[in-house]
Regions:
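A mature extracytoplasmic/lumenal domain signature
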Residues: 60-61, 108, 141-143, 173, ...
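Short, flexible surface segments
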Residues: 51, 133, 525-528, 557, ...
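Divalent metal-binding segments
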Residues: 23-29, 38-295, 301, 310, ...
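His/Asp/Glu-enriched, well-ordered alpha-helical/loop segment
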Residues: 236, 357-368, 375-398, 402-403, ...
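Gram-negative bacterial Sec-dependent N-terminal signal peptides
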Residues: 2-20
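Lipid interaction determinants
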Residues: 575-704
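Extracellular/periplasmic ectodomains of large secreted or surface enzymes and adhesion receptors
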Residues: 563-581
C-alpha cells in the first residue's frame, strides 16, 4: 500500500527520491502556494516537507498520498505561502541593539510623528519594560526631517518625561542621537565640551549648554563609553534580534559591514546555539587581513550552525540624503558644510579602490560594493575592470549595494560584466523629496531604476538597509511596485516593477546574490523548507494594498520560528562562560578587588614580556567604562574589556596607521599582541600587572 501511495505521489507531481517510502512531516494545502520559480507566477495545490526540506510540490492528491500517522496537515485557509524572504543587504549586528530599544520611526513604520508621540512611546516602553531608575533607556529611528513645524526633540522634552533615567534616542541615520541631561552627564558632554571637527553639538539658544542633539564625530564618544555586551547578552540579544527578522518573514539575514570584533561576537553566539535563522557576514575590506588571520578563507562559504562569512564589503562613497555620495556633477544644494560646487567625495581614491577589488578577486570570494552616486558607480566599474585585467572567463559574484543613482549608460556595462545591482527603492518613499532637491527632478526621480535593469536582462535585488530603514518586506515591495513619496507624489513611475518581479528580488534573485540558488529562493523539491505565510497574496490584491499585507507565520527548515507562541524553538541557551557575575571596567564599586583604583588612571608601561621598557616616552594605557585606550608611542589603539568572574575578556583592538621609527613600531606590535592575550590582571597600589595563562606579559605604574 505504501508503495502504491508513493507511486501516486510521483505520478501526480514532483517528489524527492529521499521521500520515497517516507511520510511527510508537514503538508500545506488550500492556499495560494506561489513557487517563485520561472518568469511567470506558478502556483501549486500543495507542498510537503520532510526533515527540513521540500519533498513535494504539486497537486493536492500527490501531497496527501505522503500523509502518515504523524504528518501535520496545515490548512492555509486561502492564505499565501511563499519562499522565506532573503535579506539582500542590511546591518544585522545593529539589530542586536535595537531589538532591546524603543522603536521611534515616523509613520507608517512607527509612532514617531512628532515630539509628543515620541515622548508617549518612550514612557510606554519604560513602563512596559519596568526599567529601574538610573538605567539607560535607548531608542532608535528618530527622524527630525519629518517633525511638524520644525519642532525638534530636545533634552528638556526628555528630562520632563523621564527625569530619573539617562535617555539616548538614536537618529534614524545612525550618525547621532538626542540625549537628556543625565545621558549628557553620563557620556561627559557639557557646556565646556568643544564641538570636534566634523561634529555637531546643538546648543540651547543663548547658551553653550548642549540641547540634546549630537551628530557625527561628536557622537563617537558615546560609542566609546558604551560597555560591550556580556556573554549572556550576546546570546539573548541574538535571539531577540533574529525574532525581528522572523516577524518580517525573513529566514536569511545580511550583515553587510562587519568588523573583526563583530564577527567574533556572532561566532560566539553561534557556537552557543543562539541562531534560529541563517546569518551571512561580509567583512569590511579594511579588516580583511585581521579577519583572515582568525577565519581563513577556507572556512568561508559553508554554513556552520546557521552562520557563514559570505564575501567582502567595499564602500566607495556615502549617502545621497546626507550629501556625501559621490557624483560627477555638483549638488544643487551645496555640501553638508556649505561647500560650493560640491560633488561629494569617494571613500577611497581610485588607485586604492582598484587594489581592493583586485585583492578580493584574487582571494576568490564574492564582493559587495557600496555605490550610491553615479561617480562612485564609475569608480566601481573601473576598479572591476582593473581587477579582471580583461579576463572575464572566471565567474565572480559581485553585487553593488544601493546603486541608487545608476545612469542608463551604466546598465549595459552591468549586463556585460554580469554584476548584480541591489537597489534601495524605499528611498522613493522616505527621501525622494530630498533627492530631487539635491540632484534635480530628472536624476532624483531615476533612483533605483529597477524596471530598466530588469528589461536589460539583469536580476536585481532590493533591500531595506535595516536598521536605517524599517525591517518591513511588504512595505519594501510596495515601494518598488508603486514608487510613491511620503508626500504622495509619483517618483519615476517608469521604473515601477510588477509585484511578481518585486517578490523575485527578495526571494530567487536574492538567493542568487548569495550563491545559494540551489537551496533557497523558490519552492522546489530538494530545497530548504524556508517558508513564509502571508495573510494575503501580493499578486491578488490592489497594488496600493500590498503594504498592508501581514506575516502570519515564518518557517525555517520546516520549523516554525514566528510567531513565538506557535514555534518549536528550544530555550535560549546559557552562555558557557557566563555565571551571571559579569563586570565591566568601571569606577563604581564591584566585587573585583582593585578595580576602583585602576579605572580612569593613566598607566605607563614599565616591562613587556619580562623586559624593561626604558624610553623617554613609553606607551601608556587607560581604561574605564568597558573601553580601553592605548598610546603606543606612535599610534593610538582602542578596544574593549569585560571582567568575567576573576578574569578579563579582551575585545577587538583597532589601531591608527601612522609610521614611525622601526624600534618603536616593533615595540607597538609586541605591546598590541600582549594586550590581545590578556586574561587576568592584578592591582597593587600604583602598580598594575597584566597576565596571560598565569604568566606576566606586561607591567605598569600609575602616573602620579
Amino acid at each position: 500500500m505504501n508503495r502504491l501511495r508513493v507511486l501516486v505521489a510521483a505520478l501526480c507531481g514532483l517528489v524527492s527520491a529521499q521521500a520515497l517510502g517516507e511520510a511527510a512531516d508537514t503538508i500545506y494545502r488550500n492556499g495560494s502556494i506561489l513557487t517563485m520559480d520561472g518568469d511567470k507566477p506558478t502556483y501549486v495545490e500543495a507542498l510537503a516537507v520532510k526533515d527540513g526540506r521540500i519533498v513535494f510540490a504539486g497537486p493536492k492528491a500527490g501531497a496527501l498520498a505522503m500523509k502518515g500517522g504523524a504528518t501535520k496537515v496545515v490548512d492555509l485557509e486561502g492564505k499565501a505561502l511563499l519562499p522565506g524572504f532573503i535579506d539582500a543587504h542590511g546591518h544585522y549586528i545593529n539589530s542586536l541593539l535595537v531589538a532591546n530599544q524603543a522603536k521611534l520611526y515616523p509613520p507608517p513604520s512607527g509612532p514617531g510623528k512628532d515630539v509628543p508621540s515620541i515622548i508617549a512611546a518612550l514612557k510606554q516602553y519604560a513602563e512596559e519594560r519596568k526599567i529601574p531608575k538610573g538605567e539607560l533607556i535607548t531608542a532608535y529611528g528618530y527622524d527630525d526631517s519629518v517633525m511638524p513645524d520644525g519642532r525638534l526633540l530636545n533634552r528638556d522634552d526628555l528630562d520632563a518625561a523621564l527625569p530619573d533615567n539617562p535617555v539616548r534616542v538614536d537618529h534614524v541615520s545612525m550618525h547621532g542621537a538626542v540625549l537628556n541631561s543625565l545621558a549628557l552627564k553620563k557620556f561627559g558632554i557639557s557646556a565646556e565640551t568643544k564641538t570636534p571637527p566634523g561634529g555637531v553639538i546643538v546648543r540651547k539658544p543663548g547658551t553653550q549648554e548642549p540641547w540634546g542633539l549630537i551628530m557625527e564625530t561628536a557622537f563617537l564618544p558615546v560609542f566609546d563609553k558604551t560597555p560591550p555586551m556580556t556573554a549572556r547578552q550576546e546570546i539573548e540579544w541574538t535571539r531577540a534580534a533574529q525574532m525581528l527578522y522572523a516577524e518580517a518573514g525573513m529566514t536569511t539575514a545580511h550583515e553587510g559591514a562587519t568588523h573583526l570584533g563583530q564577527i567574533q561576537s556572532i561566532r560566539r553566539a553561534t557556537d552557543a546555539g543562539a541562531n534560529i535563522i541563517d546569518v551571512v557576514a561580509y567583512p569590511f575590506i579594511t579588516d580583511l587581513d585581521k579577519i583572515l588571520a582568525g577565519f581563513p578563507v577556507g572556512t568561508w562559504g559553508q554554513y556552520d550552525k546557521h552562520f557563514r562569512i559570505g564575501g567582502v564589503k567595499i564602500t566607495l562613497d556615502g549617502s545621497p540624503q546626507g550629501r556625501t555620495a559621490f557624483f560627477t556633477t555638483p549638488y544643487l544644494t551645496g555640501g553638508p558644510g556649505g561647500e560650493k560646487n560640491w560633488t561629494g567625495e569617494p571613500t577611497f581614491p581610485q588607485d586604492l579602490a582598484n587594489k581592493a577589488m583586485k585583492k578580493v578577486y584574487e582571494l576568490g570570494v564574492p564582493a559587495i560594493v557600496h555605490t550610491n552616486g553615479d561617480a562612485a558607480i564609475d569608480m566601481f566599474l573601473q576598479a572591476y575592470e582593473f581587477a579582471r585585467e580583461g579576463n572575464h572567463d572566471r565567474p565572480w559574484n559581485v553585487t553593488t549595494i544601493h546603486t541608487q543613482f545608476m545612469r542608463k549608460d551604466h546598465i549595459p556595462q552591468f549586463v556585460k560584466y554580469k554584476v548584480r545591482p541591489s537597489f534601495y527603492t524605499l528611498h522613493t518613499f522616505y527621501f525622494a523629496d530630498t533627492h530631487i532637491a539635491n540632484r534635480g527632478k530628472e536624476q532624483g526621480s531615476y533612483i533605483s531604476p529597477m524596471r530598466d535593469a530588469i528589461d536589460a536582462g539583469l536580476r536585481p535585488t532590493n533591500h531595506t538597509d535595516f536598521v536605517v530603514a524599517p525591517l518591513d518586506q511588504m512595505f519594501m515591495l510596495w515601494s518598488a511596485v508603486n514608487r510613491i513619496s511620503r508626500a504622495g507624489a509619483e517618483v519615476g513611475p517608469g521604473q515601477r516593477v510588477t509585484p511578481y518581479e518585486g517578490l523575485k528580488s527578495m526571494t530567487e534573485w536574492a538567493a542568487e546574490q548569495y550563491g545559494e540558488q540551489d537551496r533557497k529562493g523558490t519552492l522546489e523539491v530538494g530545497k530548504l523548507a524556508d517558508l513564509v505565510i502571508l495573510d494575503k497574496d501580493p499578486l491578488k490584491v490592489d497594488r496600493m494594498a500590498i503594504k498592508d499585507i501581514r506575516v502570519v507565520e515564518t518557517i525555517k527548515e520546516g520549523r516554525t520560528i514566528y510567531p513565538a507562541s506557535a514555534s518549536s524553538l528550544p530555550p535560549i541557551p546559557t552562555a558557557a562562560k557566563d555565571s551571571g557575575k559579569t563586570y565591566a571596567w568601571t569606577s563604581r564599586p564591584c566585587d573585583m578587588a582593585g578595580v576602583n583604583t585602576a579605572a580612569g588612571r593613566v598607566w605607563t608601561l614599565t616591562t613587556l614580556g619580562g623586559e624593561k621598557v626604558d624610553l623617554a616616552k613609553p606607551p601608556t594605557m587607560q581604561f574605564a567604562g568597558g573601553r580601553l585606550s592605548v598610546f603606543g608611542g606612535v599610534n593610538q589603539l582602542s578596544g574593549s574589556y569585560a571582567l568575567v568572574d576573576d578574569g578579563v575578556t579582551m575585545g577587538e583592538l583597532v589601531s591608527t596607521k601612522k609610521a614611525g621609527p622601526p624600534e618603536r613600531m616593533a615595540l607597538e606590535d609586541r605591546f598590541a599582541k600582549a594586550l590581545k592575550s590578556v586574561d587576568a590582571f592584578r592591582v597593587q597600589g600604583d602598580e598594575l600587572t597584566l597576565s596571560s595563562g598565569g604568566k606576566e606579559v606586561a607591567a605598569f605604574v600609575a602616573a602620579k
